[in-house]
């Protein structure tokens, strides 16, 4: 988690030193949302998952796309944020709050609602609203949605958010927004707003980092070829904010650790094996009629992490739509995990009977 702040400029450097006194996390996770049978937030199940991956993950994003952030009700988002603040405080991890919406007004309303909750929970003052890295370290926002938007329109929407003066992460997600924030727009915003301190790119095109932009923390959100994208191994990124950290946090952490130890061959071999498995699982998840592929793929992997090789015998996870993840998704995921030697020997949860639901689960 050691990162130098000097490249970011004095104002941004001071912000980062305040929010990340122990260093910038290099692996972040957009946490999946677990649901009870009646559609509520399953806090017990989420806590077990969070505790399982937190040894390898330094920061969390919630609610994000992987956690159904675009579909959650305001009440559900509030429940998740309140839960996440409490849990990450105990675990000593950082928390980015997702303020997702297709229009800037929706994003602004989401931020206002979250700020009110943060003030209520941790007594932040009117300036920082409690965003001091304990645990909340800012908001994550996408540009406004629309495939025909100009860069001027995208920039205007992002400026409205950045004008709030809050620590902010910008999220490149063309799969949802239908557009990309250009490298020039990112560069101009960074020059104007020192509170813009982190850029996450899930586009897979890497145009912003390829342009030489380095004035913010750079996290890659696109899956695959993990080793080659890290700075120090020929890449441009400081770390990852990956949906697969929900299920492969240990392996992703190990890729970076091996690179830092100089074991490049082993790191790239693990990266390739992991990339192949992830591609297969995600490709299958895209064929499912319900839910989004990010959530479905990661819930399937997490299900095996929770229950081990016999996970198919346990009720599948609930989806946002109120139906369970199809058993065929679990069958396929289990086969992929076994073939690529990624199947855990045992699960982090212990059921008390065959087909046990979440009400019957307890931490192992």
Locations of regions flagged by a protein language model:
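Generic N-terminal leader/processing signal
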Residues: 1-2, 13, 198, 297
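Active-site beta->alpha loop and helix N-cap motifs at the rims of alpha/beta catalytic domains
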Residues: 2-178, 314-324, 328, 337-363
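Short, conserved catalytic or adaptor-binding loops enriched in Gly and charged residues
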Residues: 19-22, 130-132, 189, 233-234, ...
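A residue-level signal for beta-strand positions that form part of recognition/binding surfaces
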Residues: 24-26, 196, 295
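A structural signal for short hydrophobic/aromatic patches embedded in well-ordered alpha helices
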Residues: 49, 80, 189, 267-270, ...
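Catalytic alpha/beta core domains of metabolic enzymes, predominantly
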Residues: 160-169, 173-291
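Structured C-terminal cap/extension of enzyme domains
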Residues: 230-364
């Amino acid at each position: 988690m050691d990162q130098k702040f000097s490249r970011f400029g004095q104002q941004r450097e001071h912000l980062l030193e305040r929010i990340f006194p122990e260093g910038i996390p290099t692996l972040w996770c957009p946490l999946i949302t677990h649901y009870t049978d009646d559609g509520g937030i399953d806090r017990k199940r989420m806590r077990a998952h969070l505790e399982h991956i937190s040894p390898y993950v330094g920061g969390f994003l919630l609610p994000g796309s992987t956690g159904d952030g675009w579909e959650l009700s305001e009440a559900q988002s509030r429940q998740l944020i309140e839960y996440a603040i409490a849990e990450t405080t105990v675990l000593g991890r950082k928390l980015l709050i997702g303020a997702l919406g297709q229009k800037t007004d929706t994003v602004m309303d989401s931020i206002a609602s979250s700020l009110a909750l943060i003030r209520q929970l941790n007594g932040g003052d009117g300036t920082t609203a409690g965003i001091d890295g304990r645990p909340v370290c800012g908001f994550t926002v996408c540009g406004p949605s629309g495939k025909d938007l100009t860069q001027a329109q995208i920039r205007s929407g992002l400026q409205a958010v950045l004008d709030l003066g809050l620590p902010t992460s910008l999220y490149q997600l063309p799969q949802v927004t239908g557009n990309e924030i250009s490298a020039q727009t990112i560069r101009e915003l960074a020059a104007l707003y020192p509170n813009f301190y982190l850029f996450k790119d899930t586009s897979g095109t890497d145009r912003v980092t390829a342009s030489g932009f380095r004035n913010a923390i750079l996290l890659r959100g696109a899956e695959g070829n993990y080793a080659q994208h890290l700075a120090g191994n020929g890449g441009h990124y400081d770390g990852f904010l990956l949906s697969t950290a929900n299920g492969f946090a240990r392996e992703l952490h190990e890729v970076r650790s091996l690179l830092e130890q100089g074991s490049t061959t082993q790191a790239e071999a693990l990266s390739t094996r992991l990339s192949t498995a992830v591609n297969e699982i995600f490709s299958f998840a895209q064929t499912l009629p319900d839910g989004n592929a990010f959530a479905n793929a990661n819930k399937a992997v997490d299900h095996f992490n929770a229950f081990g090789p016999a996970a198919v015998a346990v009720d599948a996870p609930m989806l946002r739509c109120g139906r369970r993840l199809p058993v065929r998704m679990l069958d396929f995921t289990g086969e992929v995990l076994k073939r690529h030697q990624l199947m855990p020997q045992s699960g982090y949860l212990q059921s008390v009977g065959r087909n046990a639901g979440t009400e019957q689960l307890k931490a192992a």
